[in-house]
Regions:
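Glycine-rich Rossmann-fold phosphate-binding loop(s) that bind the pyrophosphate
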Residues: 96-97
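Extreme N-terminal segment that seeds HTH/winged-HTH DNA-binding domains in transcriptional regulators
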Residues: 1-34
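Phosphate-bearing ligand-interacting subdomains
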Residues: 26-29, 134-205
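N-terminal Rossmann-fold NAD(P) dinucleotide-binding loop
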Residues: 100
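Catalytic, metal-anchored helix/loop core of enzyme active sites in primary metabolism
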Residues: 35, 107, 145
């Protein structure tokens, strides 16, 4: 997830806003726009323009130009570099049911620099099978396998009541960041980055 030294000096709130900025900027780039103002970004994200400028100052050395704003291509490049999206990072997926299967086949993860290398489930019917090229392992081996693979990112797609236990096992295996699609609040050490996904938005996947 980018340069560790760089990220440790940035608040989790700022890091958490970067993927949304990136999605919006890519939409604008796709529409043919070349520049954008912090005010436009703020309005789309329902934030204060001052906050947006502070966030962008963290990851970009390029200042916005009066009346022109920021160059979209440069901001996209800087955010990709900051988050490590310009490098592929391996991740594991826990939960191979309906949502998990959809996530395993979601090509958009590559836009975030993520490559799912293994999936886990407790259902005997699913263990040993593959979903979209990703092999499903027994969930009881989660911690051991994550440690063996040296994976730092975990994606949780299990029912809410099981999410905390899964998160604890991921952390025990060495995971440093969790993308949580389960409808549950996770209590984790302060040095573990957590992104709680809005399920309404997730259904769009």
């Amino acid at each position: 997830m980018g340069n560790n030294k760089e990220i440790t000096n940035v608040s989790k709130a700022t890091i958490g806003r970067m993927p949304a900025y990136l999605r919006y900027l890519k939409e604008k780039e796709g529409a043919g726009e070349k520049t954008i103002s912090s005010t436009a970004i703020a309005e789309d994200q329902r934030l204060n323009a001052v906050q947006v400028r502070k966030d962008l100052a963290v990851i970009s050395s390029v200042a916005g130009k009066p009346k022109l704003g920021f160059e979209i291509r440069e901001l996209i490049r800087d955010i990709n570099r900051f988050l490590g999206y310009d490098n592929v990072t391996e991740a594991v997926l826990v939960g191979a049911g309906g949502l998990g299967s959809a996530l395993a086949g979601y090509g958009g993860f590559k836009n975030y620099g993520l490559n799912i290398v293994a999936a886990f489930d407790k259902s005997p019917e699913r263990i040993g099978r593959t979903i979209n090229g990703v092999k499903i392992f027994d969930a009881k081996d989660l911690t051991h396998t994550v440690r063996r693979l040296n994976v730092l990112i975990g994606i949780i797609a299990v029912p809410g009541p099981a999410a905390q236990e899964v998160a604890d096992e991921l952390v025990a295996g060495g995971v440093r960041a969790i993308w949580n699609f389960a409808p549950a609040h996770l209590a984790l050490p302060p040095d573990i980055a957590v992104k709680n996904e809005d399920m309404a938005a997730s259904l769009a996947i």
